[in-house]
Amino acid sequence: MKRGNLKFFYSIVVAILCLTNAVAQQQKYTAPSLSDSNSWSIIMLPDPQTYQKFERNQPLFELMTAWISENIEKLNIQLVMCTGDLVEQNEMINPNGIAANQASKQQWASVARAFGRLDGKVPYVLAAGNHDYGYSNISVRRSNYNTYFPVDKNFKTQKIIREAGLNAEGVPTMENAAFEFTSPQGRKFLLLTLEFAPRDTIVAWAKNVTNQARYKDHTG
C-alpha cells in the first residue's frame, strides 16, 4: 500500500474509533417523569420574540410547544405561562433581512401556530411585552395580541378567565385579564396578566380584582 493511501487508511480508522467511543459514552435518553406521582407541573416559557423574527428559528419554538404537548400527561402539566414579547416587532411591514426576515404578521402567525399545539389540551396564560406593542418597542399602545390570541382561541384558557380588562382601544382582551387556576390538590391561584407599563386605569382595575372577597384565600 502506498504511503499516501496508508495515511488515509489510518485516518479513517482513527475517525471511526473516535466516533465509536463518543457514541459509547453518550448517556441513554431518559424520558421525563415525575418523581412523585402526586406532583404536577407549570411550564414557564421565556420571551419567544427571537424565535419568531427569523423564519429559520420558528421551528425551534414549535419544538418547545410540541415537547410540552407530548409530555402533558407524563409531567401532569396543568398550566403553561409565558413572560411576553411574543414577537420582535408588532407592526413591521417590510423586514430588512438583518434585524428580521419575517414581517410582523408572519411573526404573530408563527407564535400563534406554535401555541396552537396546546389548544384544547392545556390552558396557557401569555403576558404582552413591550415588543408586542406599536411599531417598535411600545411606540404606541396598539397591539395585534387580540387578533392572534382572542379569548376563545383555546377553550382550556377561556374556562379559567374570570375577568378581562380593557386594552388601549377599549376592548376586553387577555392583555389585561384575571385567571383562576385550581391545582389538582384543590389549591386556588389568582393569576393576572397586565399590559407592559400598565396605564393607571389598568393598575386600578387590577387592585379592584385582587381586593375582591372571593379571592382573599387565593395564592397569587
PLM features per residue range, with description:
Residues 63-67, 110, 205:
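Well-ordered alpha-helical segments embedded in enzymatic catalytic cores
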Residues 92-204, 214-218:
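Extended active-site neighborhood of metal-dependent phosphoesterases/phosphodiesterases
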Residues 2-10:
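Bacterial N-terminal signal peptides that target proteins for export
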Residues 10-20:
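Bacterial N-terminal signal peptides
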Residues 17, 35, 70-73, 117, ...:
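Generic structural signal for beta-strand residues in well-ordered domains
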